Amino acid sequence: QIEGSVYQTQRNNSSRYVGDNARGVAVTASKFDEKVQGFRLGSPIIKNKLFIFGNYEQIERTEPGTTWTSTGSPLGGAQVSRVKYSDMVALSTFMKDKFGYETGPFEGYSNTNASKKFLIRTDWNINDKNKLTARYVNHNSNAEINISNSQSAGNGNRTTQFNAMSFKNSGYIIQDNTRSAVLELNSKISNTLHN
């Protein structure tokens, strides 16, 4: 008999999920969207003897890279940096014209995190005293991260805040790609001894 299930969940900044009031103070939630989808499937290959199971899950999350805007920005906003919009545009244009470097946006952009993983497992009841399990796990993920806040000489600060703004392409991507395979034998050697 094959058994399985499919699932999907979603969260975003909709008022269904996120409030707009904190102890009497109105708050505006940043835009985000998260989708989780997956399925599982399991079945005996040989009744009461050999079984197989698998599952898959993927997660996609988009969230603001920054909620700050520059002074003079057409976007406006509640968190305004003292850095001028015109200066950021001029710097981006200079970097492209002089070096061919695309800085990316400096406000109003999103970061994306994506993850995909699956597992395959088999269980073999060899006999009353021995059970063998084999499993394989595969996980791939990418997460866009804003520029590091590590301070340089002179106590510089590179992250977007009141005194500074950074471009999206100043950030980096963390990749977490993992593969794992396990073969496990559980044996009952005697009533008091197991491996």
Where are these regions (language model features)?
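Short, intrinsically disordered, charge-balanced linker/junction segments flanking boundaries
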Residues: 187-195
